[in-house]
Structure formats: C-alpha cells, structure tokens
Amino acid sequence: QTCALPIFIGGYLVKQFGFLMHLFLISAISLAITLSVYPHIIKDKSIKIKRLIKGKQPHRSCTIYFIGVIALLAMIPECAVVDWSSRYLLKNLNATTETASLSFACFAGTMAIFRFMGDFIRNRFNAILVMRSSSLLAGIGLLAAAMASHPWQATVAFAIAGIGIANLVPIAFSAAGNQPDISTNTGMSIVTTIGYLGTLLAPAPIGLVAEITGFPAVYTGMAAMLGMIMLL
C-alpha cells in the first residue's frame, strides 16, 4: 500500500535506464537499508515453550479458522486488483499503459490512506460494523469496475474498492490476536497462513478464469466474495 509513489519512480527509472539498471539500483538500496538497520534489531529473549503455548490447541478452536477464512476472502479480491487491474484496463477498456498503471496506483493509494486511518475508524465504530460496511463498499467498487465502459470509470471504481478493502485484513488479524481460547502467536500464525494462501495461490487461477470468461466476470465474482464477508 505504501508503493503508490515508488510505482511512479520505478516507472520513470525503467523508462530512463532500462530494467537491468532499475533492478540493480533497487537491490543496492535494499541491501544498504538492510545493513544499516541490522545492528539495531532487537534480540528475542528466550522463552520456555510451556509459557509460549497457552490456551486451547489450534485444532480445538473453530473460531480461529473462521477468522482465517475471512482473511482469505479479503485477500483474494485484493490480489485480483493488484495483479490484474492493469491488464483489465489494457485488454478490455483499451487504456494506455500510463492510465492502466494509474488504476493500480489509485487503488494502492486509497488503501494505504484508509489503512493508516484504520485504528481511528475502528475506535469510533465497532470492528464488526467496519468489517461489514467495508466489505460492502469494496464489493460495490469491484462491481462498478466490472461494469465500467471507460478506463477512468474503472480507475475510480478501483479507488473505491481500495477504501473498502483497506481494513478487512487488519481487522481479521486483530481478531486473531485477541482470541481468549488460543495464544496470540498461534492465532496469528494460523490466520496469516490461511489468509496469505490467497496471494500465493489465487493469481494464476484468476488469470486462467479471466482468459475463459473475461475480467468483468472475474471482478463480479470478487464482489460476490466480498459480499460473503458482509453476511458472515
């Protein structure tokens, strides 16, 4: 979500210097940052295993897996926009490369802004209300993107979807860490594993389905998936 500005910078570097120089610069910067922060990493204190494992064992708690499914249902639509929105605008709406890239940047930008505001929003309203209203807004955004007839319509729709998707995963992760019948470490591990399966396994099937049925059908399906979160 913090990649909206680097998208433009990266595009400029690729255009000016080519992919190899771009990758070299990114690798050098990443290495420099890693080496600079390494001495300041806080060392883990040794904790006895008996203290680490508290509460019920994972297989005894159905709630934690239910939360994991919610995270999965939220991450798959996010993945569909991140990986395929630009392709959708290029192939279906005849957008230019710049406009297609902007659609993803707008999605990432609105998602970043409202994710930073997530704590304030959840403190003002309860988490369940935020979860349901956010999934509804995200579903409306993706459905509007599927029905768009112009690149700018889809760009605005993806921006709206970003607002809705922003706090779905954080709320799920927060719930995972606050379950009374399972330790925080175990709960977070289970939910993040289930949730990130969406980003790992979803891109290829989404692309395959899009080739068969078209991207509008894909984003309509993603909207329905978000609707499932609202009803849970």
Residue ranges and their predicted role:
Residues 61-77, 159-163:
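Pair of pore-lining "gating" transmembrane helices in MFS-fold secondary transporters
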Residues 14, 114-126, 210-211:
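Helix-to-loop junctions at the C-terminal end of transmembrane segments
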Residues 14-28, 207-226:
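A membrane-interface helix-boundary motif in multi-pass transporters
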